Amino acid sequence: MSTQLQTWDFLPISMNLQGRECLVVGDTEQAVRKTDLLLRAGAKVRLLGDPHAKALKESADALNAITVIPDPFHPDLLQLCAVVVAASDSAMLNQQVAQAAQARGIPVNVVEQPELSSFIFPSIIDRHPVLVSVTSSGGAPVLTRLLRNRLESLIPHGFGRLADLAMEFRDKVRSRFGHINQRRRFWESVLEGVVSDLVFCGRTDKARAMLDDMLSGEQADAIKDTGEVYLVGAGPGDPDLLTFRALRLMRQADVVLYDRLVSPQILDLVRRDAKRINVGKARSNHTLPQQEINAMLVELAKEGKRVLRLKGGDPFIFGRGGEEIDQLADAGVPFQVVPGITAASGCAAYSGIPLTHRDHSQSVRFVTGHLKSDTCDLPWHEFVQDNQTLVFYMGLVGLPIISRELIAHGMKPSTPIALVSRGTLPDQQVLVGELGNIAKKVEEQQIPGPTIIIIGDVVTLRDRLRWMD
């Protein structure tokens, strides 16, 4: 038994308005917004309203691009119009405009009154020439806006560049592949593979060269067999701090190599069927040596896999990311790097401790606190500076040595210090003390890792700026 399909209130279509006359009635903010959309579509816009109205005066760009008519509305103004928009603050005038336009068969939109409209403006995700329209048929504009915001985070901003590249190669692909199924398979491999990732990260020239090689056949087999490595910074722990690009690559990877510092909440966002490999990196207990990790990245990519190398924080700040991509470059494996919010920045922000402040600190220094054999050749004398913030990564175990050396080189024992444990996560802890007593406090309270240590006068600002507590 067949089920009758529900009819639509509006048909979503795209209209060519290049060089065509359009009339907007009203001088409100809504009229200005609709005018901007029509101008983006290449229309010639006449606006009926007061040229001195506040909304128009605040939109100088729109005023310079349109003709403002300070006359009362008359149906004769509709001559030669492709579309009409009624956006005045008079319900009676808007209804009059709608009736006159519909009597002449001219598409009309009455703002916030879909029942009087023959067309409505959708919410738009702009990746020109790719445009995605979202509409609730005028019934739930807030819901439409929420849906658009979600889609904005899922569609890379480079989609427009990818569409331009596809159009550029359309004729070449048609000449190379005679059957539509061959062309479809080719474009699917291109748009879901390395070429699209190159475009998304701004390397369009490289993508163009790769497309030429694929079509010529000279390197088609090598391109097909070689995957790519994504070196992605996962940030300090809170999944909401991931970048859009990081999230997209996490969702398309075939295999992920992750460190101990990557939170379970972030791992949950990785593609469900991706193979997961824990490469560890706890203090003195590396699940895999760095050289084996480097070799594994190369091997997996050469198997044609999309390999996600997921690191806590930022891969280029005490993350050994440079070593890993150096070997990838030697092996000729394509890769891209996605920065993450480094632990110093994320933990400081979530603790209410600005790393720099005009009254307290004009510089900040990141230092590794991962000491080997209880010794360190750090330039301690350089750390003892006025108006400077020190941030030690991986310094929990070495905290007694760090405190002792800084005091020995001239830093006051009363210098404010904060230790942030599991920063940006729901169970974040912040322990504040002085350089001379912090090690004892940590021992008494059994603070768990991972931690960030912040030293300097900026720590005193936490009492007023602690927004997470």
Swiss-Prot record:
Gene Ontology molecular function: NAD binding; precorrin-2 dehydrogenase activity; sirohydrochlorin ferrochelatase activity; uroporphyrin-III C-methyltransferase activity
Keyword set, alphabetical order: Cobalamin biosynthesis, Lyase, Methyltransferase, Multifunctional enzyme, NAD, Oxidoreductase, Phosphoprotein, Porphyrin biosynthesis, S-adenosyl-L-methionine, Transferase
Binding site for NAD(+): 29-30, 50-51
UniProt-listed Enzyme Commission number(s): 2.1.1.107, 1.3.1.76, 4.99.1.4
Chain residues that bind S-adenosyl-L-methionine: 236, 312-314, 317, 342-343, 394, 423
Ranges where the record places region Uroporphyrinogen-III C-methyltransferase: 227-469
CDD domains tied to this protein: SUMT
Pathway stated in the Swiss-Prot or TrEMBL entry: Cofactor biosynthesis; adenosylcobalamin biosynthesis; precorrin-2 from uroporphyrinogen III: step 1/1; Cofactor biosynthesis; adenosylcobalamin biosynthesis; sirohydrochlorin from precorrin-2: step 1/1; Porphyrin-containing compound metabolism; siroheme biosynthesis; precorrin-2 from uroporphyrinogen III: step 1/1; Porphyrin-containing compound metabolism; siroheme biosynthesis; siroheme from sirohydrochlorin: step 1/1
Annotated signal peptide: none
Active-site residues, as the UniProt record annotates them: 259 (proton acceptor), 281 (proton donor)
Catalysed reaction equations from the record: uroporphyrinogen III + 2 S-adenosyl-L-methionine = precorrin-2 + 2 S-adenosyl-L-homocysteine + H(+); precorrin-2 + NAD(+) = sirohydrochlorin + NADH + 2 H(+); siroheme + 2 H(+) = sirohydrochlorin + Fe(2+)
One Pfam family named in its UniProt record: TP_methylase
Single Gene Ontology BP annotation: methylation
Residue numbers of Phosphoserine PTMs: 136
Region (Precorrin-2 dehydrogenase /sirohydrochlorin ferrochelatase) residue spans: 1-211
Origin: domain of life: Bacteria
The protein's role, per its UniProt record: Then it catalyzes the NAD-dependent ring dehydrogenation of precorrin-2 to yield sirohydrochlorin. Finally, it catalyzes the ferrochelation of sirohydrochlorin to yield siroheme.
Similarity remark: In the N-terminal section; belongs to the precorrin-2 dehydrogenase / sirohydrochlorin ferrochelatase family. In the C-terminal section; belongs to the precorrin methyltransferase family.
Annotated PANTHER family: SIROHEME SYNTHASE, SIROHEME SYNTHASE-RELATED
Protein name as catalogued: Siroheme synthase
